[in-house]
């Protein structure tokens, strides 16, 4: 017999559920874990775009520019942009046989 067995019995007022050993610590722990899992799953589905975008892009920020003069910030931006700007002649086509 399982610890999580539920028995439904008809009564005068309708159907009621009598759980065997509902005060067992294992049943209580399983119920708490189940409820927490459900809450976390619902939050994940509601906020998955925010959460995963934060994890994907939030940790890839550039170095802090606090205390750096504006001229050096602009020079850094230009270096970063020139590293990104590559014309099509620099790409190599690789053909697999």
Curated annotation (Swiss-Prot):
Activity regulation, free text: The M2 protein from most influenza A strains is inhibited by amantadine and rimantadine, resulting in viral uncoating incapacity. Emergence of amantadine-resistant variants is usually rapid.
Keyword Lipoprotein part of the UniProt annotation: yes
Signal peptide: none
Residue intervals passing through the bilayer: 23-43
Lipid addition sites, S-palmitoyl cysteine: 50
Topology term for the membrane: Single-pass type III membrane protein
GO terms for MF: monoatomic ion channel activity; proton transmembrane transporter activity
Cellular component GO terms, alphabetical: host cell plasma membrane; membrane; virion membrane
Positions bearing the site annotation: Seems to be involved in pH gating: 41
Modified positions (Phosphoserine) in chain numbering: 64, 82
UniProt key word rRNA-binding: no
Pfam families: Flu_M2 (PF00599)
Virion surface topological segments: 1-22
Record keywords, A-Z: Disulfide bond, Host cell membrane, Host membrane, Host-virus interaction, Hydrogen ion transport, Inhibition of host autophagy by virus, Ion channel, Ion transport, Lipoprotein, Membrane, Palmitate, Phosphoprotein, Signal-anchor, Transmembrane, Transmembrane helix, Transport, Viral ion channel, Virion
Localization annotation: Virion membrane; Host apical cell membrane
Region (Disordered) location: 60-83
Residues the UniProt record annotates as site (Essential for channel activity, possibly by being protonated during channel activation, and by forming the channel gate and the selective filter): 37
Intravirion side: 44-97
Quaternary state and interactors: Homotetramer; composed of two disulfide-linked dimers held together by non-covalent interactions. May interact with matrix protein 1.
Stated family: Belongs to the influenza viruses matrix protein M2 family.
Misc: When the channel is activated, one or more imidazole moieties of His-37 probably become bi-protonated.
Function: Forms a proton-selective ion channel that is necessary for the efficient release of the viral genome during virus entry. After attaching to the cell surface, the virion enters the cell by endocytosis. Acidification of the endosome triggers M2 ion channel activity.
HAMAP family: INFV_M2 (MF_04069)
Protein name (Swiss-Prot/TrEMBL): Matrix protein 2
Organism: Influenza A virus (strain A/Turkey/Ontario/6118/1968 H8N4)
């Amino acid at each position: 017999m399982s610890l999580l067995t539920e028995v439904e019995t008809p009564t005068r007022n309708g159907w009621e559920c009598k759980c065997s050993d509902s005060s067992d610590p294992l049943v209580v722990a399983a119920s708490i874990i189940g409820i927490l899992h459900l809450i976390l799953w619902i939050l994940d589905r509601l906020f998955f775009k925010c959460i995963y975008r934060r994890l994907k892009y939030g940790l890839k920020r550039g170095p802090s520019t606090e205390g750096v003069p504006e001229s050096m910030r602009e020079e850094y931006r230009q270096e970063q942009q020139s590293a990104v700007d590559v014309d099509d002649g620099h790409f190599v086509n690789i053909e697999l046989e």
